[in-house]
Regions:
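Active-site proximal helix-loop segment of RNase H-like, two-metal nucleases, encompassing DDE(D)
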Residues: 87-97
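Catalytic cores of nucleic-acid endonucleases
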Residues: 79
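RNase H-like, metal-dependent nuclease domains and their acidic two-metal-ion catalytic environment used
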Residues: 1-64, 71-75, 83, 96-232
Length: 232
């Protein structure tokens, strides 16, 4: 069974929008996607903003982006290495399984963020991933955490669950239900809040015009090109 990840919604909330307004806006979006999960970047804003969602009746999953190599889990918050998040996007790009709806207003912005993202080694020899100096990566991070969760990130024994699901679907002749995840990189003083909605589809039928990311020109190079300026 092949999974494809479709980016169907991208938004950058105006800079300076108060967090209560962002919470209300996301509540409205989730109201239109009743089965969707909300995943937010817990790294910069921490517990106070996370609790705003819970008080409003929304139960998000927090992702604390780390520089390590191992995922951790405490309550509703998962510590996820940035290497894990970015390498997963790389794999999907190479395999042609990350697709973007062609008419999204922020699609070009996301492309630029992907192109501006760089890998580098610290003095201690650790591999790091960061946006080029002076550039934003909010849409990229919203996409990365949404894809992480849509790919069963943070779940216990996801492979076993998918196996039994597939066996059941074979018996009844059905197909896997699409999985929607809303990823949010909460902005701070100089960065806007970014929202990305990803849908995971198994054995999809390509009937919607999409932009398909292209793999990087050289293996392992993060400087890939998702789309070219051409008519689809």
């Amino acid at each position: 069974m092949t999974d494809v990840y479709r980016v169907g919604y991208l938004e950058r909330v105006p800079l300076g929008t108060p967090y209560p307004s962002i919470v209300a806006h996301l509540g409205s979006l989730l109201g239109r996607l009743p089965d969707a999960e909300l995943v937010i970047d817990y790294t910069g804003v921490g517990r106070p903003v996370f609790d705003m969602f819970r008080i409003s009746g929304i139960s998000p999953i927090g992702v604390l982006i780390t520089g390590g190599a191992t995922e951790t889990h405490e309550g509703f918050v998962h510590g996820v290495p940035k290497l894990t998040l970015i390498s997963r996007l790389q794999v999907l790009l190479h395999e042609g399984r990350l697709k973007i709806h062609k008419d999204l207003s922020e699609a070009e912005t996301l492309v630029r963020e992907l192109q501006d993202f760089r890998c580098a080694f610290t003095a201690a020899g650790a591999l790091t991933f960061n946006a080029r100096s002076g550039r934003h990566d909010d849409l990229l991070l919203a996409l990365a955490i949404a894809v992480w969760r849509a790919a069963d990130g943070g779940m216990s024994n996801p492979g076993l669950f998918r196996y039994y699901e597939q066996q059941y679907l074979k018996l009844v002749g059905g197909s896997s239900k699409p999985r929607d995840v809303v990823g949010v990189d909460l902005g701070q003083s100089r960065d806007p809040t970014a929202i990305c909605i990803v849908r995971r589809i198994s054995d999809p039928v390509d009937h919607i015009p999409l932009r398909e990311p292209r793999p990087p020109p050289q293996p392992g190079n993060l400087e890939w090109s998702l789309i070219e300026r051409e008519k689809l």
